[in-house]
Amino acid sequence: MPTTTSLTTTYAGELAGEIVAKALLSNVSAGYVTMKPNVPYKSVVRKIDDTVTFAAGTCDFTPTGTITLTERILTLEEFQVQRQICKKDFFIDWTTADVMSGRVNTQIQDAIIGRLVGGIAAANETIMWSGVNATVGQYDGFETLIKAGGSGAVSAGSGALTSGNIIATIWDVINTAPAAVKGAAEKPALYMGQAAWEAYMQAQIADGNGWYLTGGPEVNRRFVGMYEIYVCPGMTANNIIFSQPSNLMLGTWQENQMNEVFILDMQNLDGSQNVRYGARFYLGAQIAVAEDITYWGA
């Protein structure tokens, strides 16, 4: 059955380049976690913790200290996006010049694929945080993995985040975290959604930090000068995660079909005026050492 097509004449124009897709969230969170770009469906991911201790100098080799290898299985899920649209409906509204020939020219193909890829990125921005594997079209996101029973991650509490409590709540999360994590060479970061970040800025402005009112995109996103604040549009409201980026792993399978999208004019195949387009790809998430992760949220 063809996908239902919604056309908006507000975006009409003679050139395919004037086709305007809806504004989509960028998958900005992918830049704040550890990417595993070529996971062949299932892979053992490891994190090494090396506790170094000094010993008195001797002529012998005597191993000291503790090396801890933590293993978890990162399993990818296969996903697909498939769409079909009638060229007649599409061209009538946007490209009069191509109606007569029925062509799907390069500009139109770029517009279709651009929207498809943007849609995949937008959907994954949310799924990578709150996705649930039992739900069709999703995999377990970081929030789901962290809050799962027996995960080992440490809860600092839950409740609504407002400009009146956001700073105190962040301190609660940080103070709950293990000292070894806060003092590690790889500093943990604070992950929060857009609403929490806006509450944080409001709190700073109320405290007299006017830079948060006028600083724009360049405003400082670091808490007390030590911990980066990563604003992740896909995170659910009233959640904060305090973790090292290496503890949050997002896997894909780029050498297989990840980022491979297609557009297919069906006219020469079945005589129809349909255009099919879509993508097939693999995604999955996993956490490494859950005990090193502190979070706020139910």
Model segments located where?
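Sequence/fold signature of self-assembling virion shell proteins
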Residues: P2-V52, D140-N165, M201-A298
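Helix N-cap / beta->alpha transition motif
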Residues: T8, C86-D93, Y191-A196, S243-P245, ...
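Long, hydrophobic/aromatic-enriched structural stretches that serve as scaffold segments
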Residues: F54-A111
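Extracellular structured ligand-interaction cores
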Residues: E78, K187, N274
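Hydrophobic side chains in beta-strands
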Residues: V81-I85, I92, M192, V231, ...
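Alpha-helical scaffold segments that mediate packing/assembly in large oligomeric complexes
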Residues: W94-T176, Y295-A298
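Short coil/turn segments at secondary-structure boundaries
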Residues: T95-T96, M128-N133, A184-G193, L213-P217
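Ordered core of a single globular domain
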Residues: W171-D207
